[in-house]
Amino acid sequence: MAKSGKDKFRIKSERLPEFISKLEDLTKISDSIKIKIESDNTMMYSILGKATVLAFKNYNIPTSELFEVKDDLEYGIDIIILNAKKFVKNLNFLKENEKVTIEITHKESQEDDTIMDARALQIVGGKLKVNWIGGEHYEIKDMNKKKLDQGLNIKNSRWSFNIDKSDFADIKKLSSINGDRILQIGVNAGKVVISETAAWEMEIDTIDAERSANLILNKKFLGCINDSDSIQFHIFDNFMLVKHEDSNLMLSFEQNWDEEDE
């Protein structure tokens, strides 16, 4: 019979707003989120697409910086949060100046005896208790941090280009005006141009003069890109990657952006 049990952690008050903000950001990809808690690292991510991953974003936070954990965990804990947008809205009523705890009721994974699958969560802060039922393990594709680090290593990218902060802000504003869902990213003789068909175009970078390419970017993912002084897009064979200090945003080329994929 599979083992079951509970774990209770305190969420560090100084990290609570950031924790909620990161969860909210992940809901821009999908309304389902997976959190993988291990002794050294906590990874949370969201995926768009079932058989094929169309978009993926994750955050990594050292577990000791997010939770107060008395001892090293002897196992990993996987939490699947369905209806994540509603979950996050509930968490926004937690107050930073109050002690906030998360209690996880779990059972041993059928596929890996070193992992516990969360069955239920209870997050308590002051007068508020947020109760949530954990999703089934098959409802979100499992992503391994080690394999992700290898697969998203920018050393394996083919080429890259940059967009500075002010240009990116203008691109988001221009994109909100016009009706197309798709932005074109064109490279001709090393000049990188982002455009919207029959509406506008903007030259945003100059790279290797011999480089030519044509890519597409769905506007809906502009809001998933974290702000920074310079945003670098790394181009791989089948996807583009925007990497920040504690996050990765992967957007696949292998899609047609049909509405049913959303």
Walk through the language-model features, giving the residues of each.
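DNA polymerase sliding clamps and clamp-related checkpoint/processivity subunits
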Residues: 1-27, 33-262
